[in-house]
Amino acid sequence: MARMSLMIMMIMVAVTMINIAKSDPIAPCYFIFGDSLVDNGNNNQLQSLARANYFPYGIDFAAGPTGRFSNGLTTVDVIAQLLGFEDYITPYASARGQDILRGVNYASAAAGIRDETGRQLGGRIAFAGQVANHVNTVSQVVNILGDQNEASNYLSKCIYSIGLGSNDYLNNYFMPTFYSTGNQFSPESYADDLVARYTEQLRVLYTNGARKFALIGVGAIGCSPNELAQNSRDGRTCDERINSANRIFNSKLISIVDAFNQNTPDAKFTYINAYGIFQDIITNPARYGFRVTNAGCCGVGRNNGQITCLPGQAPCLNRNEYVFWDAFHPGEAANIVIGRRSFKREAASDAHPYDIQQLASL
């Protein structure tokens, strides 16, 4: 029954996407800032351990391995199709010409809000670097449209999705071997530092024409197979120390949304509760057709989480029954649920104050 319910849900999402794609998108463009949860190829040419351009990544994606840290779609792929785009948003590394008018994906695996986050993994493009790349894109949009006012009007209708912070915990604060932030900051003061840096970049985006912002909260990192493998005695109980810190950060994101909405009346900000949506999935897995919530479909060691999915490794066959694809990242089936609920909330707590569909219509 659970497998049947998941199949029905995926068919319904696919039909909805096809119907939407027949008309113009409800937003002219979609700009994406983030990390490996939404990277779709920007790290492929970097000297980095944080790359996913090899099999079995992309095993269920039509184009095969592209750099997505998933067996198939990411959440922003789902959202892009629900917005009405006929194709996925192009990564900055390969975006050229008129294609940028549809939007650009700047996300980079291992990236964080802090510049040093993820440095032990090699090359990555931190939030400030992603925003700098967008400023370059804006100048190209002005050239294409031929007028600054025309470009500003066009960009004001676009959706700007920002989902960073996970690596600032996973590959910084809770990694004392490489970073001192865990000793320098309390969870509260660290979240304050992240939010101050985050806010600075939002202001740069605003200055460069962004007016519709969707801030994606950090998920329950303490429930990932990697953290369960390292820190959970029974391999099932999430690491509350990490999840508690994530919730502190998320609560401050909500405060950012409220402050910007009050102080910048010509812009609209919303918070997407990825943490809450994900918690619902792992608390009620059968509702979504999942059977395994604590292990990766592809990985090595305890919970398939001690080493992430290796090149050429054979993944599980029942991928739609696993919440996680690898040691850190949800699989396509979970991404469809998260993307769908981000676009159109199913519970009041999924988004504050708007879901992405509502944001696009404002």
From Swiss-Prot:
Compartment(s) where it occurs, according to its Swiss-Prot or TrEMBL record: Secreted
Do you know which InterPro entries this protein is assigned to?
GDSL, GDSL_esterase/lipase, SGNH_hydro_sf, SGNH_plant_lipase-like
Q: Does the keyword Secreted apply?
A: yes
* Enzyme Commission designation: 3.1.1.-
Show the Gene3D superfamilies listed in the entry.
SGNH hydrolase
Identify the catalytic residues.
Answer: S36 (nucleophile), D326, H329
PANTHER family recorded: BNAANNG05710D PROTEIN, GDSL-LIKE LIPASE/ACYLHYDROLASE-RELATED
Which protein, by its recorded name, is this? GDSL esterase/lipase At5g45670
Q: Which organism is it from?
A: Arabidopsis thaliana (Mouse-ear cress)
